[in-house]
């Protein structure tokens, strides 16, 4: 196989021009992976609602007359520290004080996550009143769905005190599976123990979508077809299998296509995943007097582990680590372009936090990646980068109308050269809109993507007209060049049963010191059928 960077024959061709198609091809794979992550996040948000703090009602009918007890003692209390709740010496013990003690002790257990701890008062006529707590331990797991693998969802829970975090985590893992709608009843057993009875209103194990849009590059004729399939519990391990693909529709001689396969396996607070993606393109490179055929492909595979290290009624925080390998090969005719053919291996760590509010939600994602580049004739053999993503959605009611504010902030920082497949995009549908044919990416960038939508329910579906505004800035480490971009857009989303559609008109402007101001307008459409 012949390798070269640029011969005299191609001296006038910019390396960025040669890299554009490879970058566009890999963008398709990145978009599929981002859609999969957004699908899981949105599913979690839809299944949870903001939990308000409830106040215990005050009972004014309780007697304040002192009872004939010298004090109170606890029995069976091992999971919380509660001695500070006991009445002080010579304090009046009455019905009101006993009710207060019961509520305070219950709250101590709830604050620690223990939700089933029945108790009773016992009088042995010694002058001390005993508050006997039966700390609920899990005695049995039951389910009306034999395909629900409870050992994967609640490992090592039998014989241990039940925590609400364990139960919430198990329900989250179960309801990530396509077609599942799992609920649980906490039922009493013997000696204060409990049994957990799971119920599943199963629909279909297979779900997915088929769609078409015109958001591909002009070079590929705009139109592309997309499809995704989500298979729940394929191996009976409460696991999920996700497959998605996209293909431009111009011709078989000039195309961009990609495929993503993702598999995840839950185990309590852990989720283990593996994935593989493939992207490929073919396109002519038009020169002044002739044209050359450019083609390339990128193969990516990896494994990851995610651990939920903290969760509450309105939030969930996870730590994740991922190892991946990526191999790109870009050819001009039968010659491999070494600079645009990196071979990468990397490891990354990240923290994700998802927070619910009364009328909105926030997603924070921080990630650091470090890796090696073993491709030939690469500028640097190692790379490092840090990424930030913030998503905030808020619903606001004005009189009888409902509005949604959607804001996304993404950023990347790298102090040294990054291969093009690891650079972040400045332009695109989910970045700065309207500039779809300007493929701009760099090591450092910051982008704000914003929409305000009016949500209107009608007999023929939900209509959401919206206004959009984007801002972005990027800088390359190899060139003293900085680009700025802004865009404004107007669009309409529509959904009815299994059908979804989008129409958007966007204007983007690029500010460059060397080339001045460039402006593009882009009208895009998207049609999706869900099954």
What are these regions (language model features)?
Residues 2-10:
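Sec-dependent signal peptide recognition
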Residues 495-531:
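Predominantly the C-terminal beta-signal and adjacent terminal strand-loop region
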Residues 20-216, 246-257, 409:
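Periplasmic polypeptide-binding modules associated with outer-membrane biogenesis and secretion
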């Amino acid at each position: 196989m012949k390798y070269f960077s640029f011969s005299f024959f191609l001296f006038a061709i910019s390396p960025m021009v040669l890299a554009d198609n490879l970058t566009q091809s890999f963008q398709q794979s990145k978009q599929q992976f981002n859609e999969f992550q957004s699908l899981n996040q949105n599913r979690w948000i839809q299944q949870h609602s903001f939990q308000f703090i409830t106040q215990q009602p005050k009972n004014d009918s309780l007697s304040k007359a002192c009872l004939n007890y010298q004090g109170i003692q606890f029995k069976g209390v091992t999971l919380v520290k509660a001695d500070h709740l006991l009445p002080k010496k010579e304090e009046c013990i009455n019905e009101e004080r006993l009710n207060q003690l019961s509520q305070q002790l219950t709250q101590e257990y709830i604050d620690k996550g223990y939700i089933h701890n029945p108790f009773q008062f016992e009088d042995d006529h010694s002058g001390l009143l005993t508050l006997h707590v039966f700390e609920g331990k899990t005695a049995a797991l039951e389910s009306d769905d034999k395909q629900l693998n409870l050992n994967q969802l609640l490992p090592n829970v039998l014989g241990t005190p039940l925590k609400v975090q364990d139960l919430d985590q198990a329900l989250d893992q179960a309801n990530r599976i396509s077609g599942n709608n799992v609920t649980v009843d906490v039922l009493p057993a013997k000696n204060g123990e409990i049994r957990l009875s799971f119920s599943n209103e199963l629909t279909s194990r297979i779900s997915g979508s088929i769609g078409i849009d015109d958001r591909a590059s002009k070079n590929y004729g705009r139109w592309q077809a997309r499809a995704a399939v989500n298979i729940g519990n394929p191996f009976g391990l409460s696991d999920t299998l996700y497959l998605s693909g996209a293909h431009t529709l111009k011709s078989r001689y000039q195309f961009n296509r990609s495929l993503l396969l993702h598999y995840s396996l839950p185990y309590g607070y852990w989720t283990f995943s593996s994935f593989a993606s493939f992207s490929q393109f073919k396109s002519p490179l038009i020169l002044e007097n002739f044209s050359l055929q450019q083609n390339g492909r990128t193969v990516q595979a990896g494994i990851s582990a995610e651990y939920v290290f903290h969760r509450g009624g309105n939030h969930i925080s996870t730590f994740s680590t991922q190892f991946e390998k990526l191999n790109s090969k870009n050819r001009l005719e039968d010659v491999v372009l070494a600079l645009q053919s990196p071979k990468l291996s990397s490891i990354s760590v990240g923290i994700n936090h998802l927070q619910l509010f009364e009328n909105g939600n926030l997603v924070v994602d921080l990630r650091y990646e470090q890796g090696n580049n073993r491709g030939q004739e690469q500028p640097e053999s190692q790379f490092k980068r840090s990424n930030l993503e913030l998503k905030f959605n808020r619903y606001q009611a004005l009189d009888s109308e409902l509005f949604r504010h959607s804001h996304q902030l993404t950023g990347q920082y790298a102090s040294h050269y990054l291969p093009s497949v690891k650079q972040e995009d400045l332009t695109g549908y989910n970045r700065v809109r309207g500039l779809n044919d300007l493929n701009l990416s760099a090591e450092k960038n910051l982008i704000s993507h914003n929409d305000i939508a009016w949500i209107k329910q009608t007999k023929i579906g939900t209509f959401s007209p919206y206004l959009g505004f984007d801002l972005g800035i990027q800088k390359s480490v190899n060139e003293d060049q900085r680009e700025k971009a802004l865009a404004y857009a107007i669009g309409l989303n529509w959904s009815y049963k299994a059908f979804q559609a989008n129409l958007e008109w966007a204007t983007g402007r690029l500010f460059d010191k060397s080339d001045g101001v460039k402006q593009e307008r882009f009208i895009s459409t998207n049609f999706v059928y869900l099954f």
